[in-house]
Regions:
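One-carbon transfer enzymes
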Residues: 1-237
């Protein structure tokens, strides 16, 4: 069974590029791609490129979809009226977030079935931004979670969650790249569930975990030192 879904992404976001790469490998082909071209997108793209510095970066969107008849639309803001009208006209069953700003209710109301996100951290324990860095600083396990989107920040029902095995050879940058891949794989699993019927739903306990902003530089450096010095508690080797 095919799934009619729209793929939303900030322009050339490396997280979204990896997700689209894996979706296409699994024959999960979006009906359309809507990329946001904005200063916010530029900042977020550079932020993730820094987090993945020295790691292999997926091809650009144009290369990934070369030879495929996937329409690509550009908007100034995924939350604006133009984007909403575009999505309403397409009537997707599902919106897939492949690295976006926080999406507002006016957009979340458009898909007939759901909006799905893949969070680069283990929910419900670490919501919000920079989960890899926070997990290192707080000495917590690394992983990813695919979940339905609700009006909160990373609070929607969980579809699938998986820990990432951390090796002593890992770096902060390699963990970010590996978690981008894991997140993308979980998104592919989630869309396969939806294409075949319904996906699992595990409600989150809102009293568990915390919602965090971008990690301050000094705390991030402490997390990196913990990993580099072998003081991280969750190695698999």
């Amino acid at each position: 069974m095919s799934l009619h879904f729209a793929f939303l992404v900030l322009e050339e976001h490396p997280y979204g590029r990896e997700m689209l790469r894996i979706l296409l490998e699994r024959d999960l082909v979006p009906s359309l791609i809507v990329q946001e071209v904005s200063e916010v997108g530029d900042v977020e793209r550079e932020k993730f490129l820094t987090r993945m510095a020295g790691q292999a970066i997926p091809p650009r969107l144009t290369q990934l979809i070369k030879g495929r008849k996937i329409p690509v639309y550009s908007v100034a803001n995924h939350n604006d009226v133009i984007c909403r009208e575009l999505l309403v006209a397409e009537q997707p069953d599902v919106l897939v977030l492949g690295g976006t700003r926080i999406i507002k209710t006016s957009i979340l109301e458009v898909p007939r079935r759901a909006t799905v996100n893949a969070h680069p951290g283990l929910l419900p324990w670490l919501r919000g931004s920079a989960s890899v860095g926070w997990a290192l600083y707080k000495d917590m396990k690394q992983g990813a979670t695919a979940h339905f989107i609700d009006p909160g920040i990373d609070t929607g029902d969980i579809i699938v969650r998986r820990e990432l095995p951390v090796h002593r050879s890992d770096t902060y940058e390699s963990l970010n790249a590996r978690i981008a891949t894991l997140s993308s794989e979980l998104m592919a699993e989630s869309l396969t569930f939806l294409a075949n019927g319904e996906a699992p739903r595990e409600p989150q306990d809102r009293n568990v975990g915390e919602t965090l902003k971008v990690i301050p530089d000094d705390l991030l450096e402490e997390g990196k030192r913990r990993l580099a010095e072998g003081r991280y508690s969750h190695y698999v080797d």
